[in-house]
UniProtKB/Swiss-Prot annotation:
Main location: mitochondrion
Annotated TM spans: 1-21, 25-45, 60-80, 96-116, 124-144, 149-169, 178-198, 200-220, 242-262, 274-294, 325-345
Protein known as: NADH-ubiquinone oxidoreductase chain 2
Organism from which the protein derives: Struthio camelus (Common ostrich)
Cellular localization per UniProt: Mitochondrion inner membrane
């Protein structure tokens, strides 16, 4: 891809995200979402492979439908109440339409169908953008409108996302699809708590971005697209694979790693809200995710599949140290002890 075109796309992504996050008017928020959609499409289809082109078309159609729903819900609300302010979403029909639109944008169940397919059709770096930066504008809109949304609908979608994200990830062999279902499950946890404690949702989202970025960058460094490649990547970068294993366990939410903090706090908040049954169900559903994260972590260690005698092993080659991955891996593993400081800052 032309470096100038790539630079323009990345600047447009940042611009669209900033416009949506900082706007109070529905039209400006919608404009930011549209800029984002149009900026990411060249990055998805940059390889010109049929799978990439198919992914970009799917992404465009789904996001266009979601944007139309955002515009329709805001116009319905303005027609009924005369308000164009994002925080004044008081009309019930507009509220339901917006919930559906944001669920499509984020890839929440039952609107998750497009997300694994699009991630599978693109490169690891673009998949990283789709899983992190592209989730920020819809999440910001969800945070601003959360007091007006229906708690029952959001809780149902959150539980379904946590269940399906864990269940569908069990039989996947492609790392991008596994991370797509991981993203769906994590978004379920965030949606669950957004009405009761929006700041906790934001903290969970930031930590999710941190851990997901670490995993994607590590996989990109070792060029790992399938589990079979992950099995043989230890010989290429043993230290990186050890750090990747810790990050995957952190994503699973195992103590004493960073990923345990948001899950622990969310379960605590749900219990405070007297939603003990929901807290129990979502905690049990996280075991599904734990299984495939453990499987990934097991494959990332020194696990070689059965090979013929003439199989060419990927021997260790000394690579220059990647400082950014080292910093991200450290943060993904050791932030739990300072959780009281993080909570005090919220």
């Amino acid at each position: 891809m032309n470096p100038h075109a790539k630079l323009i796309s990345l600047i447009s992504l940042l611009l669209g995200t900033t416009i949506t996050i900082s706007s109070n008017h529905w039209i400006m928020a919608w404009t930011g979402l549209e800029i984002n959609t149009l900026a990411i499409i060249p990055l998805i289809s940059k390889s010109h492979h049929p799978r990439a082109v198919e992914a970009s078309v799917k992404y465009f159609l789904v996001q266009a439908a979601a944007s139309a729903l955002v515009l329709f819900s805001s116009m319905s609300n303005a027609w009924a109440t005369g308000q164009w302010d994002i925080t004044q979403l008081t009309h019930p029909t507009a509220s339901m339409l917006l919930t559906a639109a944001i669920a499509i944008k984020l890839g929440l169940v039952p609107f998750h169908f497009w997300f694994p397919e699009v991630l599978q059709g693109t490169s690891l770096t673009t998949a990283l953008l789709l899983s992190t930066l592209m989730k920020l504008p819809p999440m910001a809109i969800l945070l601003m409108t959360s007091p007006s949304l229906n708690p029952t609908v959001l809780t149902s979608m959150a539980l379904a996302s946590a269940a399906l994200g864990g269940w569908m990830g069990l039989n996947q062999t492609q790392t991008r699809k596994i991370l797509a279902f991981s993203s769906i499950a994590h978004l379920g946890w965030m949606t669950m708590i957004i009405i009761y404690n929006p700041k906790l949702t934001l903290l969970t989202f930031y930590l999710y971005i941190l851990m997901t970025a670490t995993v994607f960058l590590s996989l990109n460094t070792t060029k790992t697209l399938k589990l079979s490649t992950l099995m043989t990547s230890w010989t290429k970068a043993p230290v990186l694979n050890a750090a990747l294993m810790l990050t995957l366990l952190s994503l699973a939410g195992l103590p004493p790693l960073t990923g345990f903090m948001p899950k622990w706090l969310i379960l605590q908040e749900l219990t405070k809200q007297e939603m003990t049954t929901v807290a129990t169900i979502i905690a049990l559903l996280s075991l599904l995710g734990l299984f495939f994260y453990l499987r990934l972590a097991y494959y990332a260690t020194i696990t070689l599949p059965p090979n013929s005698a003439n199989h060419m092993k990927q021997w260790y080659i000394s690579n220059p140290t990647n400082t950014s991955i080292a910093i991200l891996s450290s943060l993904s593993a050791i932030l739990l002890p300072i959780s009281p400081m993080i909570l005090a800052a919220l």
